[in-house]
């Protein structure tokens, strides 16, 4: 019986060795034909953790789970008109430039306001801008920029404005069923591999439409077919909620709006989280406002009545004064921002690793003094 078992083990081992050799030969042939890295074992990849770029909003970074937009992925931002979609995208552009990257903006709507973009922190002198004549031209330009590998972020505003050339050349009233959907489907197939290879972030802004005759369920849909929905790793639903009234002389005026950004699809972290931000007219997302709100919830900033304080020091009476204080003290803003990100696991706690034990430091000083004394005696 023992001999039979041993013989079976030898046959299995021999068969396994032959399969392993056949696999190694196949991998060598594939590598020879298609280049190194065409097929690899998942554990051999140097970068298993998804690289991200901050969205420019702390609340949105937290909602995204990974700490920002994943690099080498497609992002879709959609919502009703004037909900803040372009504002969210422009904050990403400003962040990409802040990190030393190059950003491109495909303005298919021909409606980009350079002054507003600059107010959000975008360096308009360095921003690559294209206002294409047709959808095919816009997507082709985006493809060439992505293929270059030199662009970190490409924004397309918007998918609904990417009009196929056949529709432009035709007459108003002509029926062009499915043209835009086919164009977007082909573009996604061509762009997705290049986007992943070059680690470019591609943001597609989209509008909302309503399905005709829908009695039950959500009648809202996005134009451009289903391809973008499938290929997007992250989909954000941006909707304004309530108006923000001013203070003092502006108490009867609207100075901004509360906005909810819902992560309706997320392939790199759990979805369906919501970021609540304040979009101020002419300024964009209030970074100080969202920081005060989140830090107060975590008790990093303490609130007593109308007063806000940090580390026992008062930083303002009322949220507006606290916002101004943080805006005037960027070092303090960065310190609190870092603590919040550490709390949510978006950053490692560098303070703990950098902290020095006072007793150990004193011991090191004594050792150095002793060494100096010995050298003098010598």
Curated annotation (Swiss-Prot):
GO biological process assignments: DNA recombination; DNA repair; SOS response
InterPro entries: AAA+_ATPase, DNA_recomb/repair_RecA, DNA_recomb/repair_RecA_CS, P-loop_NTPase, RecA-like_C, RecA-like_N, RecA_ATP-bd, RecA_C_sf
Record-level GO cellular component terms: cytosol
UniProt superkingdom: Bacteria
Pfam families for the chain: RecA, RecA_C
CDD domains, sorted: RecA
Principal place of residence: cytoplasm
Cellular compartment(s): Cytoplasm
MF term (GO), any: ATP binding
Residue positions binding ATP: 79-86
UniProtKB keywords: ATP-binding, Cytoplasm, DNA damage, DNA recombination, DNA repair, DNA-binding, Nucleotide-binding, SOS response
PROSITE patterns: RECA_1, RECA_2, RECA_3
Cited SMART domains: AAA
Biological function: Can catalyze the hydrolysis of ATP in the presence of single-stranded DNA, the ATP-dependent uptake of single-stranded DNA by duplex DNA, and the ATP-dependent hybridization of homologous single-stranded DNAs. It interacts with LexA causing its activation and leading to its autocatalytic cleavage.
Family in the record: Belongs to the RecA family.
Protein name per UniProt: Protein RecA
Gene: recA
């Amino acid at each position: 019986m023992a001999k039979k078992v041993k013989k079976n083990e030898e046959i299995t081992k021999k068969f396994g060795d032959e399969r392993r050799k056949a696999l190694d030969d196949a991998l060598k042939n594939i590598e020879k034909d298609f280049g190194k890295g065409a097929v690899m074992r998942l554990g051999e990849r140097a970068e298993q953790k998804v690289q991200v770029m901050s969205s420019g909003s702390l609340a949105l970074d937290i909602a995204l789970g990974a700490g920002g937009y994943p690099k080498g992925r497609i992002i879709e931002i959609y919502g009703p008109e004037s909900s803040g979609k372009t504002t969210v995208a422009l904050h990403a552009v400003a962040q990409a430039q802040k990190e030393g990257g190059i950003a491109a903006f495909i303005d298919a709507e021909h409606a980009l306001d350079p002054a507003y973009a600059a107010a959000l922190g975008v360096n308009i002198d360095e921003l690559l801008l294209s206002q294409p004549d047709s959808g095919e031209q816009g997507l082709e330009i985006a493809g060439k920029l992505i293929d270059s590998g030199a662009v970190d972020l490409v924004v397309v505003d918007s998918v609904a404005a990417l009009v196929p050339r056949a529709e432009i050349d035709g007459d108003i009233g002509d029926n062009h069923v499915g043209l835009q959907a086919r164009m977007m489907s082909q573009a996604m197939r061509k762009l997705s591999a290049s986007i992943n290879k070059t680690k470019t972030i591609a943001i597609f802004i989209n509008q909302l439409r309503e399905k005709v005759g829908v009695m039950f369920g959500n009648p809202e849909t996005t134009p451009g077919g289903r391809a973008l929905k499938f290929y997007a790793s992250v989909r954000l639903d941006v909707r304004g909620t309530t108006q923000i009234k001013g203070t003092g002389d502006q108490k009867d005026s609207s100075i901004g709006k509360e906005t909810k950004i819902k992560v309706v699809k997320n392939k790199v972290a759990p979805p369906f989280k919501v970021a609540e931000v304040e979009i101020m007219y002419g300024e964009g997302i209030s970074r100080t406002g969202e920081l005060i709100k989140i830090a107060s919830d975590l008790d990093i900033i303490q609130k007593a009545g109308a007063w806000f304080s940090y580390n026992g020091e008062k930083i303002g009476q009322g949220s507006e004064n606290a916002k101004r204080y943080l805006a005037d003290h960027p070092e303090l803003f960065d310190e609190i921002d870092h603590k919040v990100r550490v709390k949510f696991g978006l950053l490692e706690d560098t303070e703990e690793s950098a902290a020095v034990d006072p007793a150990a430091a004193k011991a090191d000083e004594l050792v150095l003094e002793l060494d100096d004394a010995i050298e003098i005696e010598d």
